[in-house]
Amino acid sequence: MQNYENTYRRLLLYADSMKIIDTHEHLQPNQNYLGDQPDVLCDYLSHYITTDLMSAGMSGEDLEKVKDYKTDILKRFKILEPYLESVKNTSYYRALEIGAKKIHKINEISVRTIEELNEKFKKAAICEDYGRNIMKNLCNIEVSINDNWSQDMKFSTTDLFVPTCQFSPDGNLSENLTFDEYCENYRQYFLKQKNDGMKTIKNVMAYWRTLYVEDVDYNTAKDLYTEVLKNKIDFPRKLEDYMLHVLLKIADENNFVIQIHTGLQEGMGNNLENSNPMLLRNLFNKYQNLSFDIFHMGYPYERELIVLAKTYANVYIDLCWAHIISPVAARNAFYEMLDVLPYTKILGFGGDYCFFDGVVGHITMAKQDICEVLAKKICSGECDIDLAEKILQAVLHDNAKRVFKL
């Protein structure tokens, strides 16, 4: 029987030596997210851990005070400290602590260290190659699929990134456009993005509505479009549904991969039922030649998603965000995926961060999760080291390269 610790360490060393393809980020140019000057609290509290802090009782008003970089950082940290202490058990916090340690050589985030951490962060973040050094040298990432929440693809079209953009059904509305012209403009927009290097289109509509999409006929959609322009109303759901089908046909014709947010939504008080991946079955059936990259392992609907990926050849499971939502859930789901699915259906890592330090923590946790599961499978006799290394190479690199045609 294999020794678990030795096996785990061997796999981890192998993972550390590999180039990794990062399936999903929201990374920004430094000047976009650092504002007037770099500040580690503004950066680290830009998302994710803020949900834990607010869950622990922190008010939005106090959060804004903590992120006011013009105020002394010790004063701000004293507001943050009681809430931060109560979330130090969470995976979101752990990712930040790992990033602070690996990048800035600070072992904890505390009142004792915050000034030094901030000074080191500020000094590093103003360097032009800050992000490149993190992604290429610390993380060994070959390329990332990047949604920087911008219609300007320039930042995301470099050797660091491949751009993606979000489905927006009501973009570029104009009273001067007929419905047919509007649909054609939609098509031309995505063709332009394809020429700029885009490989995927991202659907995040589970944040505001159900993932279920009906079939809507042309005349109904055209009448609704006319009503929207005439009465200045929001896009009705049926018109959104029609435009999503337009998008999926464009994607099918142009070999785009559709990335879909499922499961847990970032932030407070969202409707989780909107995001169950089972709501997508009719699309998987209708567009069988189109590849669907289903995000966040569907958590907490990961078992439903595993079954979908098993029974639909065009459905892939993406563990982006998953390892910092819950490493335990990610490990359990990955173990089960390997029991149920071809390993070629699994995409193992996407940082899903808007700042670079977070990626370091997340990729560290992801490699630990994946290697722990594979080591357990080796030690239980379910696979040998050669197969485990093939799986590791596939889920962290080769599968994404093939699916996204990189």
Task: Kindly label every feature range from the protein language model.
Residues 37-156, 183-196:
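Alpha-helical scaffold segments that flank or form the walls of functional sites
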Residues 20-22, 141-145, 160-164, 198-202, ...:
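Structural preference for beta-strand elements that scaffold enzyme active sites
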Residues 1-21, 43-102, 343-345, 360-406:
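Mid-to-C-terminal alpha-helical segments outside catalytic/metal-binding sites
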Residues 146-151, 157-234:
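Metal-coordinating catalytic core of metallo-dependent amide/deamination hydrolases
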Residues 19-32, 258-265:
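Histidine-centered catalytic micro-motifs
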Residues 30, 261, 293-297, 318-321, ...:
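Short acidic/histidine-rich active-site segments
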Residues 31-35, 268-277, 302-311, 327-335, ...:
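Histidine/acidic-residue-rich catalytic or RNA/ligand-binding cores of hydrolases
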Residues 199-304:
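Divalent metal-binding pocket/active-site signature
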